[in-house]
């Protein structure tokens, strides 16, 4: 009985998979509609006076649209696969049923299923009759049949077909479930969902409209005049029977059930659904006269900005500076919003924007750190190190790359000889000591040669890995230009959200580290390490020239930034900085 109950649960789950997949795709399509509706509500509430991170809002919408499109794709793929699987299972019903009889079964699905439900309810009420009939039926443990016949009998029970011995057939197929109540519930659920083809077609039509919208926005963009003209003048849908290339409803599970109910006319569906997203529509999801007037009032621009031809929106991560400081315009905009009583409607969009901005920035920063390191490690272990080591040991006869390496090796060899002679002098004299000394010096020389040979290989390897690192980082910065803009905007937002005292503290900390009194010693150590890492000799003149010029240039740039930018954005920070510096 336990296996029978599991079989019943499996069939329930299998035949409800198309409904679950279609429902997920439908919910994802509604999310696409809702995200644009919320953004339009946010733009209408804020108005044109606010310039709140327009570029980041666009990126947020793109991310949500891409995620929803992916969910729709995989849900429709699951829907199609499950439909085909159900078609295959339906084709495995009792082999004694010919095609004409099976067509008759599907055409009379409504009537036979209701009768089957009534019979099950009658059997449930009359438990004595059911128990008596079960005594006349051979138990499942002693009755063997093929897997195809088991599934076929179960499907025949679902679709309402019954052989002549109706009571024995129902009783025998009830052994696939744990109780009659479960069969009644499942048959009702299967009956209600399968007959509702009108709802299926409406959901598929809605999903088709959303996919057309996403394709339009992806190919033509939000701000192109062609896309906006098509949004203002939507074209009717293509024929429903030929429009679905991604999801094709066919097979005995679908085609025969479609004979019971006719698909609604296209005029009715076109009245319920808008073929394109109309951002300026008054009633979202439908093309009404008020929506057309609303779109015309804003000239069809979903963001409330002027569009001239195919003019592109300037990619800026934050608002540019103008004659009026940005803080004043933001304060006036928020004050106007508070007076209009629209502040509550701005909390959720701003929270979503801040959350998206922070998560995207942290992910991109971690990606910039770990991705180059991972690429360099893999390339170094698998390709670069074996190739360079083989080339250096076979094609090159020299050991040292620079004169500084030879000097270091010579000094090291002299130190080894001096230590060995010191050991001989302090030890007892013997005749074999000169021979032992020569052998020890020879062995130490071989060790030094191997050490500096490996050091030369590592220097060449570092040279190539540094170029590879620079190439990977530049590629990531170019590829993630939008995310870099979000990271830049997020860092500025975090910095400007601090108090004036904390801002001045971090500015002082940075300046003292880079151009402070003790900074030249740090620069000397840093430049010397970089030169040694790249394989160059330690040149004091080059290091002194760099230390005497670069901090001065950096100090000049920093003072200009304070005078030109920070003094206009927040004068209080400059006052706090000078006070703490003094």
UniProtKB/Swiss-Prot annotation:
Reactions performed catalytically:
K(+)(in) + H(+)(out) = K(+)(out) + H(+)(in)
Keyword terms: Antiport, Chloroplast, Hydrogen ion transport, Ion transport, Membrane, Plastid, Plastid inner membrane, Potassium, Potassium transport, Transmembrane, Transmembrane helix, Transport
Q: InterPro entries from the entry? A: CemA (IPR004282)
Q: What is its main location?
A: plastid
Enumerate composition-biased segments (Polar residues): 284-299
Membrane topology type: Multi-pass membrane protein
Q: Which Pfam family would be a valid example here? A: CemA
Q: Name one GO biological process term.
A: potassium ion transport
Keyword Protein transport listed: no
Q: Where are the transmembrane segments?
A: 364-384, 460-480, 507-527, 543-563
Q: Does the keyword Transcription apply?
A: no
Note down the stretches annotated as region Disordered.
284-307
- Region Insert: what ranges? 183-316
Which Gene Ontology cellular component terms are annotated? chloroplast inner membrane
Subcellular locations according to the entry:
Plastid, Chloroplast inner membrane
Q: Which GO terms describe its molecular function?
A: antiporter activity; proton transmembrane transporter activity
Q: What does this protein do?
A: Contributes to K(+)/H(+) antiport activity by supporting proton efflux to control proton extrusion and homeostasis in chloroplasts in a light-dependent manner to modulate photosynthesis. Prevents excessive induction of non-photochemical quenching (NPQ) under continuous-light conditions. Indirectly promotes efficient inorganic carbon uptake into chloroplasts.
Describe the family membership recorded for this protein in Swiss-Prot or TrEMBL: Belongs to the CemA family.
Q: What is this protein called?
A: Potassium/proton antiporter CemA
Organism of this sequence: Staurastrum punctulatum
């Amino acid at each position: 009985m336990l296996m029978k109950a599991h079989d019943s649960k499996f069939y329930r789950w299998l035949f409800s998979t198309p409904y679950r997949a279609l429902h997920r795709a439908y919910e994802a399509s509604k999310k696409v509609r809702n995200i644009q509706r919320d953004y339009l509500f946010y733009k209408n509430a804020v108005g044109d006076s606010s310039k709140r991170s327009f570029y980041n809002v666009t990126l947020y919408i793109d991310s949500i649209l891409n995620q929803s499109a992916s969910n729709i794709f995989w849900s429709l793929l699951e829907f199609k696969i499950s439909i085909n699987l159900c078609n295959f299972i339906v084709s495995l019903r009792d082999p004694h049923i010919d095609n004409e009889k099976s067509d008759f079964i599907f055409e009379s699905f409504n009537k036979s299923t209701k009768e089957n439900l009534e019979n099950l309810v009658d059997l449930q009420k009359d438990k004595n009759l059911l128990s008596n009939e079960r005594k006349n039926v051979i138990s499942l443990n002693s009755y063997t049949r093929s897997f195809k016949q088991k599934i076929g009998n179960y499907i025949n029970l679902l679709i309402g077909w019954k052989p002549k011995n109706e009571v024995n057939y129902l009783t025998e197929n009830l052994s696939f479930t744990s109780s009659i109540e479960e069969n009644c519930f499942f048959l009702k659920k299967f009956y209600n969902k399968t007959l509702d083809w009108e709802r299926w077609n409406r959901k598929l039509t809605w999903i088709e409209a959303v996919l057309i919208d996403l394709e339009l926005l992806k190919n033509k963009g939000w701000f192109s005049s062609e896309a906006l003209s098509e949004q203002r003048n939507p074209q009717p849908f293509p024929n429903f029977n030929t429009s679905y290339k991604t999801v094709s409803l066919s097979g005995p599970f679908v085609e025969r059930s479609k004979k019971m109910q006719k698909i609604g006319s296209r005029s009715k569906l076109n009245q319920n659904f808008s073929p394109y997203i109309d951002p300026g529509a008054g009633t979202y999801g439908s093309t009404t006269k008020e929506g057309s007037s609303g779109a015309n009032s804003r000239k069809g621009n979903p963001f409330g900005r002027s569009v001239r031809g195919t003019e592109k929106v300037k990619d800026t991560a934050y608002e540019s500076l103008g004659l009026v400081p940005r803080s004043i315009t933001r304060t006036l905009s928020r004050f106007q919003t508070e007076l209009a009583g629209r502040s509550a409607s701005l909390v959720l969009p701003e929270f979503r924007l801040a959350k998206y901005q922070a998560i995207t920035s942290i992910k991109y920063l971690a990606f910039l750190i770990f991705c180059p390191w991972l690429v360099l490690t893999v390339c170094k272990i698998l390709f670069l190190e074996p190739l360079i080591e083989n080339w250096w040991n076979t094609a090159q006869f020299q050991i040292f790359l620079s004169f500084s390496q030879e000097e270091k090796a010579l000094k090291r060899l002299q130190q080894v000889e001096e230590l060995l002679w010191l050991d001989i002098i302090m030890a007892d004299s013997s005749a074999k000591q000169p021979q032992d000394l020569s052998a020890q010096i020879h062995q130490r020389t071989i060790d030094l040669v191997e050490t500096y040979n490996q050091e030369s290989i590592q220097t060449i390897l570092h040279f190539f890995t540094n170029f590879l690192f620079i190439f990977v980082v530049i590629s990531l910065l170019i590829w993630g230009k939008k995310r870099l803009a979000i990271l830049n905007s997020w860092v500025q937002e975090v910095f400007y959200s601090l108090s004036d005292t904390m801002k001045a503290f971090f500015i002082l900390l940075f300046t003292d580290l880079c151009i402070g009194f003790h900074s030249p010693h740090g620069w000397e150590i840093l430049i010397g390490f970089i030169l040694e890492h790249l394989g160059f000799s330690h040149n004091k003149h080059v290091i002194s020239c760099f230390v005497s010029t670069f901090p001065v240039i950096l100090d000049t740039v920093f003072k200009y930034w304070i005078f030109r930018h920070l003094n206009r954005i927040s004068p209080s920070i400059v006052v706090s900085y000078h006070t703490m510096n003094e």
